[in-house]
């Protein structure tokens, strides 16, 4: 497909993921339901919608970010791409974490807002500022950006491994084994590394076997891809059944969310969508502000309508 069409599809996809992130963080049944039985039923419905569908959003962001980073990548492009990510990731990460910290410092000292925020006065100290800026202490949804920054910093190592077919497949196999065994890594999440490396592997081979991602496909090609995804879903459900190979394994959750991302990519690619509007291109802003507003609206509504 043409470059403009590809970019429009990316904007549509990331906009969809942004809406799903808001959806996941909009759970509010426990704030309004008076009886435990009613609250439990509402929570069950919210869990089905949010956990089954909404949880593909962050893996999707990891994979889109990785695919774009390694699209047409070479060693000569490493420094320019790092410089670009400092502007688009690191600086906004620090700025928004600072704003959230100052917002909590201020709001917890205002009588009208302190009750809504539900925190004791947040101290303004050097240690607190460091925790807020670096460790996203007052902006929990930015764990994703923290992980993404780490992954971008590891770009040379990831590129060296994933640019080879055999080494890339072996690396993904090792990560899959680690997820199956429920292994953990210090600081970096293994599932985030798996999503990022999977997309990097495809992107680095977009001129060969990975070209199908960007190629136009007719009705027959889309139907074949949908049939493949359907078979993959059946296989995953079978392996994830009680006593199955993936039962109660983190690898099942990771594969299920990876399947969801693939389904979303196919849906956006196959759909005849109009050009992305300008406001749809500012997904970082929506991601940055949504959590505070969603929680503020929910808590304020719970106070006003007990």
Where are these regions (language model features)?
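Membrane-cytosol interface segments of multi-pass membrane proteins
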Residues: 1-175, 277-278, 282, 304-306
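Short, structured coil/loop segments at alpha-helix boundaries
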Residues: 3, 36-43, 139, 157, ...
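Short, isolated positions within intrinsically disordered regulatory regions of eukaryotic proteins
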Residues: 16, 27, 86, 100, ...
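Aromatic-anchored segments of alpha-helical transmembrane domains
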Residues: 19-26, 97-98, 172-186, 226-240, ...
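Specific transmembrane alpha-helix
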Residues: 58-71, 147-159, 180-213, 252-272
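Interfacial loop-to-helix transition and helix-capping segments at the boundaries
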Residues: 46-58, 133-147, 180-198, 233-262, ...
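Alpha-helical transmembrane segments and terminal signal-anchor/GPI-anchor hydrophobic tails
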Residues: 194-198, 204-285, 291-306
């Amino acid at each position: 497909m043409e470059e403009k069409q590809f970019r429009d599809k990316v904007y549509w996809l990331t906009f969809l993921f942004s809406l799903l992130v808001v959806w996941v963080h909009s759970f509010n049944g426990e704030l309004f339901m008076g009886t435990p039985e009613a609250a439990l039923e509402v929570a069950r419905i919210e869990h089905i919608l949010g956990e089954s569908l909404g949880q593909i959003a962050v893996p999707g962001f990891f994979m889109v970010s990785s695919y774009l980073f390694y699209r047409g990548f070479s060693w000569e492009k490493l420094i320019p791409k790092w410089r670009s990510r400092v502007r688009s990731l690191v600086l906004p990460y620090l700025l928004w974490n600072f704003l959230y910290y100052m917002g909590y410092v201020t709001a917890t000292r205002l009588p009208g807002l302190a009750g809504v925020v539900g925190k004791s006065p947040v101290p303004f100290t050097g240690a607190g500022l460091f925790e807020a800026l670096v460790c996203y202490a007052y902006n929990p949804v930015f764990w994703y950006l923290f992980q993404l920054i780490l992954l971008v910093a590891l770009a040379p190592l990831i590129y060296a491994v994933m640019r080879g077919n055999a080494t890339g497949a072996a690396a993904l196999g090792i990560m899959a084994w680690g997820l199956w065994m429920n292994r953990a890594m210090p600081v970096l999440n293994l599932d985030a590394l798996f999503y990022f490396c999977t997309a990097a592997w495809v992107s680095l081979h977009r001129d060969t076997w990975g070209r199908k991602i960007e190629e136009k496909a007719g009705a027959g090609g889309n139907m074949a891809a949908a049939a493949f995804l359907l078979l993959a879903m059946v296989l995953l459900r079978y392996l994830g059944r009680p006593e199955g190979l993936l039962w109660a394994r983190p690898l099942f959750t990771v594969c299920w969310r990876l399947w969801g991302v693939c389904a979303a990519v196919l849906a956006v690619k196959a759909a005849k969508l109009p050009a992305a509007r300008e406001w749809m291109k500012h997904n970082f802003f929506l991601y940055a502000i949504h959590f505070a507003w969603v929680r503020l609206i929910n808590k304020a509504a719970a106070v006003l309508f007990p």
